[in-house]
Amino acid sequence: MAVRKGHHRAYNIHYHIVFPIKYRKVLLNEPTVATLKTITYDIQDRYELEIEQLGADRDHIHLLCSAHPKYAPGQLVRLYKSITARELFKRHPELKKELWGGELWSDGYYVATVGEKGNWSVVERYIRDQGHKPQDVQLRLL
């Protein structure tokens, strides 16, 4: 989480973004998530983004990223949703059968800024653990 520098600027901006699948359909399996990660890192290389963590559950994804200040959070969401939807539909045509209307992502999203002094490690661990079953900690009577 170092300060990134460029011509006439220095910044340290991190976003936690959640993208739900349209209709909260359960469509994200291992091959789809692997493809999604490949597409995500291609987006990172093309745009001034740094993907710090990507976690997927069966019906939504969490993204922890650092972005150039020229991108508003809404622009990042639009960019990510459009590219990933187009590429996932190309590489996994079976997704189109599950979703009518040609849309992969729901219209809504969640975005929050993440600071290194407060909730960074909590958010990073939460995203990393997406898709894994939580360990049940059930207290039992003797």
Residue positions per predicted region:
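Basic nucleic-acid-binding interfaces
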Residues: 1-142
